[in-house]
From Swiss-Prot:
Origin: domain of life: Bacteria
Task of the protein: Forms part of the ribosomal stalk, playing a central role in the interaction of the ribosome with GTP-bound translation factors.
Gene Ontology molecular function terms on file: large ribosomal subunit rRNA binding; structural constituent of ribosome
HAMAP family given in the database record: Ribosomal_uL10
Lineage: Bacteria, Pseudomonadati, Pseudomonadota, Gammaproteobacteria, Enterobacterales
Record organism: Yersinia enterocolitica serotype O:8 / biotype 1B (strain NCTC 13174 / 8081)
Gene Ontology CC terms, in alphabetical order: large ribosomal subunit
Entries under Gene3D superfamilies matching the protein: 3.30.70.1730, 6.10.250.2350
PROSITE patterns from the UniProt entry: RIBOSOMAL_L10 (PS01109)
Protein name per UniProt: Large ribosomal subunit protein uL10
Length: 167
């Protein structure tokens, strides 16, 4: 169905608004993936705080102008599915990586984070970013480990000192 000018402007405005509030974006080619699989992907995306949309490349190019995702323009070739992560920068990358593992025809093209283009081969960099809770848990674990190690070293030094005095 052909879009009139107002429809195209509405799509560009919607995508531009989502892009302004997004932390990262991932672009993929979903040719050959069945509708029920795409529906599952969209459902998982909604649960993860990821906005997904298939948009014409010309409209998408206009929508990302002036955003940190302008670096993705060269990847807008063929059918383009774009996903914007608004809650966690690695959410869309993690979702697409897992989906591509189960669906051979689904191809991740590239991602963008803080204005930097991340090629598909390096998408793991973005997908493995810890969530806020995971980062806090790792930090707390490191801090507890350091405190326990210091206690052990202090007790060992105290033991050595008492042994030296007794000898």
């Amino acid at each position: 169905m052909a879009l009139n000018l107002q429809g195209k402007q509405a799509i560009v405005a919607e995508v531009k608004e989502v892009a302004k509030g997004a932390l990262s974006a991932v672009v993929a080619d979903s040719r050959g993936v069945t509708v029920d699989k795409m529906t599952e992907l969209r459902k998982a995306g909604r649960e993860a705080g990821v906005h997904m949309q298939v948009v014409r490349n010309t409209l998408l190019s206009r929508a990302v102008e002036g955003t940190p995702f302008e670096c993705l323009k060269d990847t807008f070739v063929g059918p383009t599915l774009i996903a914007f992560s608004s809650e966690h920068p690695g959410a869309a990358a993690r979702l697409f990586k897992a989906f591509a593992k189960d669906n051979a025809k689904f191809e991740v093209k590239a991602a963008a984070f803080e204005g930097e283009l991340i090629p598909a081969a390096q998408i793991d960099r973005l997908a493995t970013l810890p969530t806020y809770e995971e980062a806090i848990a790792r930090l707390m674990g490191t801090m507890k480990e350091a405190a326990a190690g210091k206690l052990v070293r202090t007790l060992a030094a105290l033991r050595d000192q008492k042994e030296a005095e007794a000898a």
